């Protein structure tokens, strides 16, 4: 879906949530640290969820 094309958003908060996002340049789901607020849809709790939705 289109959420897979959204940019990675860490957000301004300083929590530490290991998440995955779909990197549209590489075509792969990639780990990143999410700050906990003001994110977007390209933010998955598991690699499997990211791959399932973005078909990586």
UniProtKB/Swiss-Prot annotation:
Alphabetized CDD domains for the sequence: Kunitz_SHPI
Other known facts: Negative results: intravenous dose (up to 1mg/kg) has no toxic effect and generates no behavioral disorders in mice.
Gene3D superfamilies to which the protein is assigned, alphabetical: Pancreatic trypsin inhibitor Kunitz domain
UniProt cross-references to SUPFAM superfamilies, sorted A to Z: BPTI-like
Disulfide bonding pattern of the chain: 4-54, 13-37, 29-50
Protein's UniProt name: TauPI-stichotoxin-Hcr2d
Organism: Radianthus crispa
Site (Reactive bond for trypsin): 14-15
InterPro entries registered for this protein in UniProt: Kunitz_BPTI, Kunitz_BPTI_sf, Prtase_inh_Kunz-CS, TFPI/VKTCI-like
Pfam families named among the record's database cross-references: Kunitz_BPTI (PF00014)
Residue span(s) of domain BPTI/Kunitz inhibitor: 4-54
Keyword Secreted found: yes
UniProt GO molecular function: ion channel regulator activity; serine-type endopeptidase inhibitor activity; toxin activity
Lineage: Eukaryota, Metazoa, Cnidaria, Anthozoa, Hexacorallia
Record function comment: This protease inhibitor shows two different activities, it inhibits both the capsaicin receptor TRPV1 and serine proteases. It partially blocks the capsaicin- and acid-induced response of TRPV1, a receptor of the pain pathway. It also weakly inhibits trypsin and chymotrypsin activity (Ki=0.5 uM and Ki=7 uM, respectively). In addition, it may also alter tachykinin levels by suppressing endogenous proteases. In vivo, it shows antinociceptive and analgesic activities. It significantly prolongs paw withdrawal latency and blocks heat-induced and chemical-induced acute pain.
Subcellular location: Secreted; Nematocyst
One cellular-component annotation, GO: nematocyst
Record key words, sorted: Disulfide bond, Ion channel impairing toxin, Nematocyst, Neurotoxin, Protease inhibitor, Secreted, Serine protease inhibitor, Toxin
Domain of life: Eukaryota
Family: Belongs to the venom Kunitz-type family. Sea anemone type 2 potassium channel toxin subfamily.
């Amino acid at each position: 879906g289109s959420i897979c094309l959204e940019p990675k958003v860490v957000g301004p908060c300083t929590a530490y949530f290991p998440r995955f996002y779909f990197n549209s340049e590489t075509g792969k789901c990639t780990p990143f640290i999410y700050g906990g607020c003001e994110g977007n849809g390209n933010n998955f709790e598991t690699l499997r969820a990211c791959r399932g939705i973005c078909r990586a």
